Amino acid sequence: MTFSKTVIASVWVLGAATSLARGVAAAPTEHFSYARFGEVSIYRAASEPRDVVLFVSGDGGWNLGVVAMAERLTAAGALVAGIDIRHYLAQVEKSNEKCVSTAVDFENLSHYLQAKLGIKHYLQPTLIGYSSGATLVYATLAEAPEGLFKGALSIGFCPDLDLIKPVCKGSGIEALPRLEKGKLKGVNFLPAKQLSGKWISLQGQIDQVCLAPQTTQFIEKIPGAEIVTLPKVGHGYSVEKNWVPQYLAAYTRITALRPDATPAPVLPAPVADLPLTIVPALGNSSAWLAVFLSGDGGWAGLDRGVAAALAKHGVAVVGWDSLKYFWSPRTPAGAAADLDRVLRHYAREWNKAHVLLIGYSQGADTLPFMVNRLPANSHELVGLTALLGISDSATFEFHLANWLGNASDGIPTAPELAHWKGSRYLCIYGEEDLDSACAQQTGGLGIPVKMAGGHHFGGSYEAIAAEILKHLPNL
């Protein structure tokens, strides 16, 4: 690098000051502090937001330059959370964790932010970053499971980051240590083999910090990544007419993408009010229909992976997003009535006589309450239920406390399992998952199944699907 990112950031501030004089940038509507992010600055759209943006600053911190850019997005209907990368990375380095995995931090921030601000319906967030923040949002998207983020927009991207801790192995992103005079100064990220969402990078052709030829070569190695070249732009982004139109166009392309890989374009009227995603069966369709309640992260990594594996074996899946569903308060009886609607509609629509129910994490916690309250006709359709990573209590509403680690108002799951009605159920848990209630299951209709890994089962989606299919009754 020819110049430091911090010096260039100060140049950008001078350019942004002109924008302030024209009334583009404004003070944040509020601040709050959350976990290792520290103080987060909030910029709201005039109406109910259409998108949520997690915007990470460069090495200069959350200053006028990134503020002006955040304000541009509020005019487009976004709610923007401004993050100071200096504070975040400092807290990451101070933590007791041996390696770095950032996707879960940004996911938790999005959940907390939207609940705290009273967003009516949960919105899948978009990641945006400038300079070192551009690098961080790329790495976060690369390690995130599909469905967590809409995508990421990087402004002034370099593939290196001043991060001393190593990146966690198996997280989807790889990096090599960056040494200067024999001392570890950071990491150099490698091109990701795949990304979980759309990534667009704005690249100044006269950027003397993140050189265009090297950056372009890096990005072109990543499937689906897109680079937007800016002929008259360096690393400072000071002259608005040279980058603002491309910036807003890139943001629009990311947020216009459908977040789910295979959703039903329009759900049928009987279930149109529910957050469902249809995963069609591939090849020869079986006699079984699966309804899958996701974990509290929404219809994302494990849920999508297991559903895709089942679809390969001919089982069509109705995916149910627990994050969006329980964003509004629910009751066991009300949730059971909604499940009844789903079972009756799709069993009739797809001509299926047998239903496989699956729940993961929060979906597993709540599913026993729903099954035990199903009407007799729907109950008779259920041939097997698989509970993945069930805990000892269930919550039927998203609470801020869930993401602060001090939730204590859940309903015990043990009594529901003890009074389980109908067909048998699988209680599948990872051997490292200390919070699972499956290990205590003895007798009754439950079949404990121990698998490798922890709460996320080490990403072994095919193995989970195979275990479930192995127990399907031969009807």
For the regions a language model picked out, list residue spans one by one.
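N-terminal cap/lid segment of alpha/beta-hydrolase-fold proteins
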Residues: 24-48, 239, 245-285
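Short, surface-exposed "cap/lid" segments of acyl-processing enzymes
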Residues: 46-77, 82, 280-315, 319-322
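Acidic beta-to-alpha connecting loop that harbors the catalytic carboxylate
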Residues: 56, 205-207, 232-234, 293-296, ...
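Post-His helix in hydrolase/transferase enzymes
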Residues: 238-253, 334, 459-471
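Primarily recognizes the serine-hydrolase "nucleophile elbow" in alpha/beta-hydrolase
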Residues: 114-183, 345, 353-411, 416
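Histidine-bearing beta->alpha loop at or near hydrolase active sites
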Residues: 87-88, 231-238, 323-326, 451-457
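Alpha/beta-hydrolase active-site loop
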Residues: 95-119, 329-350, 365-369
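The feature captures the conserved acid-bearing segment of alpha/beta-hydrolase catalytic domains
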Residues: 44, 162-221, 280, 392-445, ...
